[in-house]
From Swiss-Prot:
Residue interval(s) of motif Nuclear export signal: 267-274
Function: Hydrolyzes ATP, and can also hydrolyze GTP with lower efficiency. Has lower affinity for GTP.
Keyword Nucleus set for record: yes
Subunit structure: Monomer.
Residues that bind Mg(2+): 36, 56
Domain of life of the source: Eukaryota
Predominant place of localization: cytoplasm
Gene encoding the protein: OLA1
OBG-type G domain mapped to chain residues: 23-283
Cofactor entry: Mg(2+)
UniProt name for this protein: Obg-like ATPase 1
GO cellular component: cytoplasm; nucleolus
Annotated keywords: ATP-binding, Cytoplasm, Hydrolase, Magnesium, Metal-binding, Nucleotide-binding, Nucleus
Sequence intervals crossing the membrane: none
Amino acid sequence: MAPKKAGDGVKAHPIIGRFGTSLKIGIVGLPNVGKSTFFNVLTKSQAAAENFPFCTIDPNESRVPVPDDRFDFLCQYHKPPSKIPAFLNVVDIAGLVKGAHTGQGLGNSFLSHINACDGIFHLMRAFEDDDITHVEGSVDPVRDIEIIHEELRLKDEELITQSIDKLEKVAVRGGDKKLKPEYDVMCKIKTWVIDEKKAVRFYHDWNDKEIDVLNKHLFFTSKPMIYLVNLSEKDYIRKKNKWLIKIKEWVDKHDPGALVIPFSGALELKLQDMSAEEKQKYLEENMTQSALPKIIKAGYAALQLEYFFTAGPDEVRAWTIRKGTKAPQAAGKIHTDFEKGFIMAEVMKYEDFKEGGSEAAVKAAGKYRQQGRNYIVEDGDIIFFKFNTPQQPKKK
């Protein structure tokens, strides 16, 4: 029997969320916390900094290149005419107000936009500015977090109640045994979200069948959330703000494991208008750096996305896949024929390629692997796929 290849036969744990790679992350927050400023600097700075294909889907949605030193190295090494990075789809969502779940403010429109997203950049304001009024009358980001969490939970409460009522009629009173397991799972979700008043994602032990039900309904509180704290330029540079510890304490208690990333919309806006040389000088003088690359990478990872590379003299490209994707399905991202006629994936680890300096050196070191159809592709793999070309039907 042939030895098992690395990565073969490993069962991937199911992921809560929409299946696919064209996933979106929405910027959510109360009015006047800096959402549009953040969206604009995020999209414009990345578009201006790199000569990559850039696409504004509409005024409130953009594709942002994911910064990656590995991609940059491969481009410098191969110097191809075509360079295509991975992208993060970002949506600027109108400000939420208290009572949105009942239709207050933009209410239902706001919630439908969140529903179309797969993750959330939860942006809150931690700076004072007399010229920018706060919808709640004062700056208190912890209160703002709780308002948004409660609005999303209350909308889920409404959706869960409706679903249970429908299932009860069919599965319990109607005796439909096929739907009884879904009804039981919905009752467990109800206990957690309605009785315990907690978000779906705060519970980390949903089993496979429960995740199947969650993915059928895609509740608001199941979406991964990254907490972005908008500071004044001064506070961001000195890394001090009275709210940061309180925000971190709240997140650690209620959403353990979630990222809290401070940034300064004011600083990012200032940097956007500088030349590359001016920007570098300003950052060095103030001993700081832009938070945007970290935020983009975090958003991409939160959507359970990763990418592998194809690299050569004609093109270096990052191909987006879901975590846990097997080699044939990864090949299918390039072309359906690659998946249908899949033979094997020849894989190099980026680190091995960089250290060795060439494909030949990786092979000489015995680190060039041939992987079968059960191989789970890892982030940053450099892959060459071998496949059979499907035969064309003979003309009569």
